[in-house]
Amino acid sequence: MRRCLAVLASRHDASCAGLPDIAPVAPLAQAVRRAIRFDSAQAQVLIGQPGIARSDPDCFALTAGNYVLGGGGFVSRLMQEVREKRGLTYGISSTFSPALQAGPFAVALQTRPDQAAQALDVATGVIRDFVAQGPTPEELQAAKDNLIGGFPLRLDSNAKLLANVANIAWNGLPLDSLETWTDQIARLTADDVRAAFQRHLQPDRMVTVTVGAQP
């Protein structure tokens, strides 16, 4: 893998014109809410804000924390609060999509139009509480176990290996990124995760878009 990365770097043509710089993504100054009328049985709700670049050192803490918040399926807080306890949706998830620049953080759900406001209130409350308090040590350990245990599945084919090599090269990551990934996750503490979420998410300044029939 290191040889592949070295070859990619050696074949860079210095005479090739570089792409223009992209302006950094500006943080949101205030919350924005948009309701778009659309005749459908389900309302689509999206909550989000600018997130992080892939090179951000908080990427590992946010990855582990997001598993607890909304990336871990039925064990996540969003799924437990919005679906399991209240039956407001079949599914809800949160994602960070880091890129060269700050990619989005987003929470997505579908619900009946007459339940959209309640589902939104519950989801934003969960986000706010998680940013304020972070995960419990038990939640974080479960997330770490899942992420570390599933890591080999990200490398179990040539296509996946090549995709990881391309990701390292594209984002300018350290060449030993795959070798150290599980260690970076394993050493995280609940305080690390809480601090990272507080640095990067502003629950009271997110954009919310609801598309569907108005109740």
Predicted regions and their residues:
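M16/insulysin-pitrilysin zinc metalloprotease superfamily fold
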Residues: G72, S97-R154, D176
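Non-catalytic beta-strand/loop surface segments
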Residues: A6-D56, G70-A117, E139, D183-R205, ...
